[in-house]
Design a protein with these regions (language model features):
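Exposed, low-structure sequence patches enriched in small/polar residues
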Residues: 1-204
């Protein structure tokens, strides 16, 4: 259920789910040897599995937005707890914060200038299997934890009637902290990059 307070720009959502006979993809590591009989590595095998019991997931999400004149600060914090991290892994805590200012130039050009950050605590994030284009539970033998790394971006949006010009600087904190810049195992986040462009809405 959700409780919302418009006056304070606050919303709280709490939920509990009970999932029975949960089906999922899993990655199994199969060891293989070289011609001399020595261990050479692992090969991946993707399989479909089903958990015969029940998995419970508790979640609570708090949205809190602030506005002080031209300054805006939008926030979301989510807490999740799964009863079985081995088959349904979830980060305990995830957060998003967006701080920006909005003002006008010459009364016609609306400017939005700010930055945002995303963060989640460490967990065994699902692996990606390109051969089936699906996410899978990591193999217990070689699984790795991801998270505890903020992803920071900066941006500017310029609005003129139906036209928007934007500049995004993504992953501005590249190379800092624990450098664990992954959302999916073995697939690093792109280093700092700049995107810019123009969009037009064709309506009156």
């Amino acid at each position: 259920g959700t409780l919302s307070w418009k006056r304070t720009r606050t919303a709280l959502t709490v939920g509990v789910e009970n999932i029975k006979n949960y089906a999922y993809f899993a990655t199994d590591k199969i060891a293989y040897n070289d011609e001399g009989g020595q261990f050479a590595g692992y090969s991946n095998r993707i399989s479909v599995k089903q958990y015969g019991g029940s998995v419970q997931v508790f979640s609570a999400r708090l949205n809190q937005n602030f506005k002080f004149g031209i300054l805006h600060w939008d926030n979301e914090v989510a807490y999740q707890k799964t009863s079985n991290q081995d088959i349904l892994p979830l980060p305990d805590l995830s957060a998003y914060s967006n701080l920006y200012i909005v003002f006008r130039i010459a009364k016609v050009l609306r400017v939005q200038l700010g930055g945002d950050v995303r963060y989640f605590t460490e967990y065994y994030a699902p692996d990606y299997a390109p051969i089936i284009q699906q996410f899978t539970v990591q193999s217990p033998e070689t699984r790795m934890k991801l998270g505890n790394y903020p992803i920071c971006n900066a941006y500017v949006n310029l609005f003129l009637k139906h036209c928007r010009f934007y500049v995004n600087v993504n992953h501005v904190n590249n190379g800092t902290g624990n450098k664990n810049a992954f959302l999916v195992p073995h697939y690093p986040i792109n280093p700092m990059n700049i995107h810019f462009g123009l969009s037009w809405n064709f309506f009156n």
